[in-house]
Amino acid sequence: MSNETNSSNFIKNIIINDLETGKHDSIITRFPPEPNGYLHIGHAKSICLNFGLAKEFNGKANLRFDDTNPLKEDVEYVESIKEDVKWLGFDWNELNFASNYFDEMYKRALILIKKGKAYVCDLTQEEMREYRGTLTEPGKESPHRNRTIEENLDLFERMKNGEFKDGEKTLRAKIDMSSPNINLRDPIIYRISHSTHHNTGDKWCIYPMYAFAHPIEDAIEGITHSICTLEFEDQRPLYDWFVKECEMENIPRQIEFARLNINNTVMSKRKLKQLVDEGIVDGWDDPRVPTISGIRRKGYTAEALRNFCSEIGVSKVNSTVDSQMLDYFLRENLQPKAPLTMGVLRPLKLIITNYPEDKIEMLEIENNAKDESQGKRLVPFSRELYIEQDDFMEEPVKKYFRFFPGNEVRLKGAYFVKCTDVIKDENGNVVEIHGTYDPETKSGSGFTGRKVKSTIHWVDAKSAIPCEFRLFEPLILDDIPENEGKHFLEQINPNSLEILQGFVEPTQIKDAKPFDKFQFVRNGFFSIDNKYTTDEKFVFNRIVPLKSSFKPGK
């Protein structure tokens, strides 16, 4: 699958032109998350794009934390973001914090005030909204808009010195209250917040707004191409205004691309936080949420995620990607290397009545059905086995060829076995089935005397390792979860997690560790959970089923 199609990557074309015309000798990009939550798969697209472009064009990429809001940020998120970037396979040129530039930002704000381009305003947030106007009506000027430069300098310094309460005053850019672009109607540059910052402590009680801080940070770092998502397109004129009016030496270019949306998936950080806070999911790393921590715990590989992000490419048009596309890339990634093993998720005991009670036979079974070079393993086989409950049906429906009374099937890598008896409990539930095997039908023996229509997997009851299986379905029922007509909590799937107690064959997993991946015969690709697996018990997360109707390019 080619990575060069990628919507003909218009950002690459911009970079190529900038390098060929000599506008830049080299490029510097950045990934600038706010450390107020865990990164999700949408951020993975941005990480792959920014770091990938820097690598492709022999440039540099910085990791910068836009930590300008002390009320929402935490060191926990800083560390998780660093881990996510590293896990995806990238490293940064510089590790920066917006808060390290607070002194410089303050100086640039003073430049605006001295040029008559910024003023201290006393309007409340509610009053400011009333003055701002609408998309069809111009705004009204603040009564404080024409304060003198001297008065503004004095008030701004007093804001910095902590003389005013939170929300009592703001510093605003003085642009155009009648602009058709609402972002240019005197946006706030600084607000007062008497809060302890995770990096600067209590040094500051005024903090820059993102729209002001971001272009200043980019210019300070010499970023050549400031790549962001499409919702910032209307803010580009403001971005350019701040770079120009703050007299920045370096002039970065903001470029917007469409964000990643995936069906049945909540991508809003605010909504994800609500799911975590209300205990609907098991933390930020719950395998059902699209955080990078969550999909890593579920068992996704960084390579599959990078391939997915490369294939969807970049565009100027918002769209929703089918989640099965990501699953496709995961299967493609795991199929060649995840060792084949047998696990029974919903066990039903099978007793082979004519097999010797004290006999244990070691059978050779392939490690990868599509790659003989991976060899074979020895799997124990004895009189008592476990099979899947749905591999038996007392009264079979049409075209059901697995176990039913009188029917014969092949046990994978073993023998033909015919169902001879059914054991039920006092409530009529099937708890055990009996059968007989034919010693002449051993796999690999060349037996051709008769054929069966079904092969099923199994585990040996004596040696099988008890374990837990966790199966996941989409957390959100609505195909488009951002549907504004419903509250997203109304779309929660009550059956998004199923926990089963079953068994796995011992050969492949006896020395396994968290995050190891396996292909369970007929059941899917699984990964060992890093949170609930203990020395006493393995917990397996199903990453994806084995098959899907999804085909790339359709």
From Swiss-Prot:
GO biological process: glutaminyl-tRNA aminoacylation; glutamyl-tRNA aminoacylation
Keywords from the named record: Aminoacyl-tRNA synthetase, ATP-binding, Cytoplasm, Ligase, Nucleotide-binding, Protein biosynthesis
Record's subcellular location: Cytoplasm
Catalytic activity entry: tRNA(Gln) + L-glutamine + ATP = L-glutaminyl-tRNA(Gln) + AMP + diphosphate
EC number, UniProt record: 6.1.1.18
Residues given in the record as L-glutamine binding sites: 66, 210
Chain location of the short sequence motif 'KMSKS' region per the record: 266-270
Enzyme class: ligase
GO molecular function annotations of the record: ATP binding; glutamine-tRNA ligase activity
InterPro entries (alphabetical): aa-tRNA-synth_I_CS, Gln-tRNA-synth, Gln/Glu-tRNA_Ligase, Gln_tRNA_ligase_bac, Glu/Gln-tRNA-synth, Glu/Gln-tRNA-synth_Ib_cat-dom, Glu/Gln-tRNA-synth_Ib_codon-bd, Glu_tRNA_lig_a-bdl
Sites where the protein binds ATP: 34-36, 40-46, 229, 259-260, 267-269
Motif ('HIGH' region): 33-43
Quaternary structure annotation from Swiss-Prot or TrEMBL: Monomer.
Similarity comment text for this entry: Belongs to the class-I aminoacyl-tRNA synthetase family.
The protein, known as: Glutamine--tRNA ligase
